[in-house]
């Protein structure tokens, strides 16, 4: 047995040659080589790939010449580039997805406001989105408001009749619907129906590079995709809220009359005495704010989607959840700002 070596630049890899008719040779280069550079005091480590080859050598019986064949080869996925031994702190840290998505919300909202002020509105897309958000969402909103109104009526009538406050039931229902229930319930329904649609549509366009195609064609995605959805949501939510308030009060009055024997006239008269114009105006303002929150968050989550079909699903779910959280936070802030101090709306209903 004799030993040879193959010299390649400054590296030596030993090989062994076996004078046999059938031989299996395993070649394993070194895993780590230390290289010193003249004039440099800093050392670098070069990781060479680990290669395992199985060679079969067969001698021809006729002429004695060897024939060699390679059966398999396995290569590690280690990084071959020179790397410093001492890494800088936080060199591999990247911000969370929620951080840069949260930062994209005020940026996109500001761009939408600038487009509206400059008059850069794509009216055809705006009307299409307004039809989707308004009339096509009306049935679900009215159905939800009907059953929520009847559920609250059962609780209020059951307790107020024991106290002899039948004439206050309509006022309490009217205040609850106008100030809280109608705007919040309508926004929740729209967030589940349209917010998810916005995030899924824009997310699919983002991962399929359709937004890049719009930029190549000279169309701004903010003008063409996002601004129409924001305008449609802000315009449709107040009208949906008003319709939900009307249907909710009607269902409550019908249930009170049919089940508990409280006349519809008593419910309507009590509601008329308790309600004030500011209650309806505050509901409209709340619904507009909620519509802006739903559309901006859903569009922001959509245009920042990555990861293909899985990323689209995650963005859609996350957009709806964050929209609901934003609705509840905004509802608390607006309610604490609109209705401060002690109220006297029910004093005329007793």
Curated annotation (Swiss-Prot):
Its main location: plastid. Residues 118-136, 190-229, 310-318 are stromal. It is found in: Plastid, Chloroplast inner membrane. One of its GO terms (biological process) is lipid transport. Disruption phenotype: Disruption in the biosynthesis of ER-derived thylakoid lipids, and accumulation of oligogalactolipids, triacylglycerols (TAGs), and phosphatidates (PAs). Reduced growth with stout leaves and siliques. Impaired embryogenesis. Keywords: Chloroplast, Lipid transport, Membrane, Plastid, Plastid inner membrane, Transit peptide, Transmembrane, Transmembrane helix, Transport. InterPro entries: ABC_MlaE_roteobac (IPR003453), Permease_MalE (IPR030802). One of its GO terms (cellular component) is chloroplast. It holds the Pfam family MlaE. Residues 158-168, 251-288, 340-350 are chloroplast intermembrane. The chain crosses the membrane at residues 98-117, 137-157, 169-189, 230-250, 289-309, 319-339. Residues 67-86 are annotated as: Disordered. High levels in green tissues, but low levels in nongreen tissues such as roots. GO terms for molecular function: lipid transporter activity. It is a multi-pass membrane protein. It comes from the Eukaryota. Permease subunit of the TGD complex, a lipid translocator at the inner chloroplast envelope membrane made of TGD1, TGD2 and TGD3. Interacts with TGD2 and TGD3 with an overall subunit stoichiometry of 2 TGD1, 2 TGD3 and 8 to 12 TGD2. Interacts with TGD5. Required during embryogenesis. Permease involved in lipid transfer from the endoplasmic reticulum (ER) to plastids, and necessary for thylakoids formation. Belongs to the MlaE permease family. PANTHER family: ABC TRANSPORTER PERMEASE PROTEIN-RELATED, PROTEIN TRIGALACTOSYLDIACYLGLYCEROL 1, CHLOROPLASTIC. This is Protein TRIGALACTOSYLDIACYLGLYCEROL 1, chloroplastic. The lineage of its organism: Eukaryota, Viridiplantae, Streptophyta, Embryophyta, Tracheophyta. The gene is TGD1.
């Amino acid at each position: 047995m004799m030993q040879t070596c193959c010299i390649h630049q400054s590296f030596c890899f030993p090989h062994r040659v076996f004078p046999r008719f059938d031989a299996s040779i395993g070649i394993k280069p070194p895993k780590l080589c230390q290289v010193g550079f003249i004039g440099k005091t800093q050392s670098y480590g070069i990781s060479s790939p680990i290669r395992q080859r199985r060679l079969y050598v067969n001698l021809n019986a006729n002429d004695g010449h060897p024939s060699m064949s390679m059966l398999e080869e396995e290569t590690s996925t280690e990084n071959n580039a020179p790397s410093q031994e001492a890494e800088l702190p936080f060199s591999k840290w990247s911000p969370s997805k929620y951080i840069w998505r949260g930062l994209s919300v005020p940026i996109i909202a500001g761009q939408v406001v600038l487009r509206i002020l400059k008059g850069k509105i794509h009216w055809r897309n705006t009307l299409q989105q307004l039809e989707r958000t308004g009339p096509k969402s009306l049935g679900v909103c009215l159905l939800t408001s009907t059953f929520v109104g009847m559920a609250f009526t059962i609780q209020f009538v059951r307790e107020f009749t024991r106290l002899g406050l039948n004439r206050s039931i309509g006022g309490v229902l009217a205040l609850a619907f106008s100030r809280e229930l109608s705007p919040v319930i309508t926004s929740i329904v729209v967030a589940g129906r349209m917010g998810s649609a916005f995030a899924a549509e824009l997310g699919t366009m983002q991962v399929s590079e359709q937004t890049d195609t719009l930029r190549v064609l000279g169309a701004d995605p903010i003008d063409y995709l996002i601004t129409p959805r924001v305008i449609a949501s802000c315009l449709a939510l107040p009208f949906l809220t008003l319709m939900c308030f009307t249907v909710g009060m009607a269902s409550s009055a019908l249930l009170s009359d049919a089940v508990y024997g409280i006349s519809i006239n008593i419910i309507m008269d009590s509601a008329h005495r308790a309600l004030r114009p500011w209650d309806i105006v505050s509901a409209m303002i709340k619904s507009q704010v909620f519509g802006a929150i739903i559309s901006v968050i859903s569009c922001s989550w959509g245009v920042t989607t990555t990861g293909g079909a899985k990323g689209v699903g995650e963005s859609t779910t996350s957009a709806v959840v964050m929209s609901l959280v934003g609705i509840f936070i905004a509802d608390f802030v607006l309610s604490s700002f609109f209705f401060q101090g002690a109220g006297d709306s029910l004093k005329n209903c007793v």
